């Protein structure tokens, strides 16, 4: 179930040159699982902006977004105390599997939804390895935050300026029991091909409504068409059709 509400900005600050962290205060009761997203209405924009939930508690929700267009540029200029019209409780989120060693793989702005998942997995006593993939060292964010949760953090950069040179698939551990991933489509496909176990994929798609009515984000699976906004954004490996 989703809920519309007015949220107040408590924090809005840059993590890198183009990536920002925003903390919103409001009714978070409808956010119930890691990997869900919110949909933000912006003044003068017809469509809401879907942004994954990085973390949440009983009072606030934290999002991390990249400035890529007019809408997110508008968000980056907003100040604490300003308000936003937000839909919460969107998407299915990740389902935690009872395994010993979980592998989390995030690329770019696919990193944020894995943070709350990592927190939940660590609270359940699971060993967690996190692979964070970026283009350069200047783009890296949240590595210390994942490490503070007790996860082993591996960083990859395309240019080799920090961590392993290459892609997230170049940093896989020898053994793990299950994986969760979020990132751009080419990365997800590479993870699918490289992975040796079952896992869950969170897809990033353009969408109109955010709650399954417009069918603008429909995708094909082995079990029929699914809407990324409502039936996803998380799909299990066994149902994905590339």
Predicted regions: what they are:
Residues 1-82:
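Ferredoxin-reductase
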Residues 1-3, 225-242:
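Short, basic/aromatic-enriched C-terminal tail that caps enzymatic domains
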């Amino acid at each position: 179930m989703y809920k519309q509400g007015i949220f107040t900005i408590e924090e809005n600050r840059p993590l890198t040159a183009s990536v920002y962290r925003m903390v919103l205060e409001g009714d978070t009761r409808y956010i119930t699982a890691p990997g869900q997203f919110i949909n933000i209405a912006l003044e003068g924009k017809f469509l809401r902006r879907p942004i994954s939930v990085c973390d949440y508690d009983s009072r606030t929700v934290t999002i991390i977004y990249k400035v890529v267009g007019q809408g997110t540029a508008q968000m980056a200029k907003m100040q604490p105390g300003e308000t936003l019209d937000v839909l919460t409780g969107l998407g299915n989120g990740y389902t935690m599997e009872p395994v010993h060693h979980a592998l989390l793989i995030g690329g770019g702005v696919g990193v944020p939804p894995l943070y709350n998942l990592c927190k939940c997995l660590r609270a359940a006593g699971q060993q967690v390895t996190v692979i964070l993939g970026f283009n350069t060292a200047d783009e890296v964010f949240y590595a210390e935050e994942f490490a503070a949760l007790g996860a082993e953090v591996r960083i990859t950069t395309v240019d080799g300026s920090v961590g392993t040179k290459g892609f997230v698939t170049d940093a896989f551990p020898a053994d793990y029991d299950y994986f969760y991933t979020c990132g751009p489509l080419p990365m997800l496909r590479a993870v699918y091909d490289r992975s040796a176990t079952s896992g869950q994929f969170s897809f990033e798609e353009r969408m109109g409504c955010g709650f399954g009515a417009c069918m603008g984000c429909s995708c094909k699976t082995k079990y029929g068409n699914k809407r990324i906004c409502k039936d996803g954004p998380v799909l299990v490996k066994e149902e994905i059709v590339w």
